[in-house]
Amino acid sequence: MNNHIEALSYYLGAFVDELTRLDVCDVVISPGSRSTPIALLMEQHEGMNTYLHVDERSAGFFALGIAKAKKRPVALLCTSGTAAANYYPAVCEAFHSRVPLIVLTADRPHELRDVGAPQAMNQFNLYGTFVKQFTEMALPEASEAMYHYARMTTQRIVANACLAPQGPVHLNFPVREPLIPDFSLESLWDKGRSEYTGVVQQGNAVMPSEYVDSLVGRLSHMEKGLIICGDDSHAEIAMFATQLAEKTGYPILADPLSNIRSGHHDKTMVIDCYDTFLRNEKLKETWNGDVLIRFGGMPVSKSLTQFIKKQTKAVHIVVDESGQWRDPALVATEVVQASDIEFCKAAIEKMPVMKKNDWSLMWQHINEKTKETLREMETYETAFEGKVITDIVRVLPEDATLFASNSMPIRDTDSFFFTSDKNIHVMANRGVNGIDGIISTALGASVICDPLVLVIGDLSFYHDLNGLLAAKLHELNITIVVVNNDGGGIFSFLPQYEKKEHFESLFGTPIGLDYEHVVKMYGGSFSRVNGWEQFREEVRKGTTTEGLHVVEICTNRDENLTLHRTLWAKTMDVITTSLQGESK
């Protein structure tokens, strides 16, 4: 018995210690019996920050949020059985949004598998193709070889999570009872440790000089170019993309998640209203570029994606440091396997300064005309959902974070988050674009990002109410703006809206919930606002005081649709007039 406890303690102690040596210092733990030894060791290790979350589905997204904000791997730990299955949605999101998670599941030992033992199921490859690596760990043994094995496996799994494309990995730990480690053992954390940590150093792909010369030569003869920036994890992309735009004269179509629309860099070449003006069919048909250079994930904007598809005669250069480039439009003619930063640096160094031409001036002109029209909604007194975004940005302090939920909030952020000299970081879950786990992800991000404001619809808010517990347990600061249109507002913009007979029951889905009581149950403050001045004041108050603050603004789905369409129609008239003026 003592040999088992000693082996368990040293073997798992070596694993936990190696995680911290590799800078995996945050773990989200859901309570359970079989995971007891790992949980206790993690709690005991001075280098590990532990976060408890009872609901595994919420816990998975909470860890995802920390990892997204910290840009470092975060560990997840749960017991065996369906607890592990509840991580699945967060693992899927992490895989497609390229976020490193270290998923740790405890398991029954081999003699208790497939024999009807309680809380035992097949956990081999549980997450299928949504993890970069699955490893079944060996049972604990008291030997130097096994302690080295624990550390080396940790090094491999963490390295894999961090290598491009980053993503989740899964370690399954079978353990036998008894499950309590012996903390009185000497040198508990030192077994298998060498003087040097086995860190896998990730290098940058260097583009061959011949290719750079060829690229620069071609670009210098392509006047009509665009730089399209989607969701990007590189903090420096704003500086380098804008420098490349200045050299080439190519406008930057900046998705809000690129974080190029705000900050202290030069935004002369940044186009922020393309989602609206690219709805103009004539413009989409007649504005044909020579080259499109794309960084990061695909943009939120559907009209931009349609525009990209129509650029059949252009050279499409997709820059992606992994072999899994993102091109749902299926138009890539050239894939450069390098980081966005390295690509920009190489091109900037050798690129001559190209003169601004009619192409870039045309994009800038239409963008400004569109923005002038869209800004008319800032005078609206009615509860327009687009104004939620502009008014939040108006009161957010420097270095704040705006987290946009999926469905309508991220689309309104795309349309109404205009360029700003304030440094505001925008986040969202755009891997598989689900409405689940949004509260939990935002709360995870708030561990690192403070202040943080989440904009979320009422259905998405309902979907992850359990996530609010993290704010109470870990004393987190967050302001949540609930845009309550009593249902699925996005469906009013889709063809389903025309099927009136079944629209409300199948798509509108009003649920008629009063969220005030549940917010107070989790120790938060709740405010239902009745005007824009009160709205701005409540958001401002939330960002300057501690704790959980929920601000609800009630809107009408039909009225919101009408206001969006009115703005689009006005913009189309302005664009048509501008295009006619240019053609004379």
Swiss-Prot record:
Its EC number is 2.2.1.9. Keywords: Magnesium, Manganese, Menaquinone biosynthesis, Metal-binding, Thiamine pyrophosphate, Transferase. Binds 1 thiamine pyrophosphate per subunit. SUPFAM superfamilies: DHS-like NAD/FAD-binding domain, Thiamin diphosphate-binding fold (THDP-binding). Its cofactor is Mg(2+); Mn(2+); thiamine diphosphate. InterPro entries: DHS-like_NAD/FAD-binding_dom (IPR029035), MenaQ_synth_MenD (IPR004433), MenD_middle (IPR032264), THDP-binding (IPR029061), Thiamin_PyroP_enz_TPP-bd_dom (IPR012001), TPP_enzyme_TPP-bd (IPR011766). The keyword Manganese applies. It is an enzyme of class 2 (transferase). Pathway: Quinol/quinone metabolism; 1,4-dihydroxy-2-naphthoate biosynthesis; 1,4-dihydroxy-2-naphthoate from chorismate: step 2/7; Quinol/quinone metabolism; menaquinone biosynthesis. GO terms for biological process: menaquinone biosynthetic process. The keyword Manganese applies. GO terms for molecular function: 2-succinyl-5-enolpyruvyl-6-hydroxy-3-cyclohexene-1-carboxylic-acid synthase activity; magnesium ion binding; manganese ion binding; thiamine pyrophosphate binding. It catalyses: isochorismate + 2-oxoglutarate + H(+) = 5-enolpyruvoyl-6-hydroxy-2-succinyl-cyclohex-3-ene-1-carboxylate + CO2. Catalyzes the thiamine diphosphate-dependent decarboxylation of 2-oxoglutarate and the subsequent addition of the resulting succinic semialdehyde-thiamine pyrophosphate anion to isochorismate to yield 2-succinyl-5-enolpyruvyl-6-hydroxy-3-cyclohexene-1-carboxylate (SEPHCHC). Homodimer. Belongs to the TPP enzyme family. MenD subfamily. This is 2-succinyl-5-enolpyruvyl-6-hydroxy-3-cyclohexene-1-carboxylate synthase.
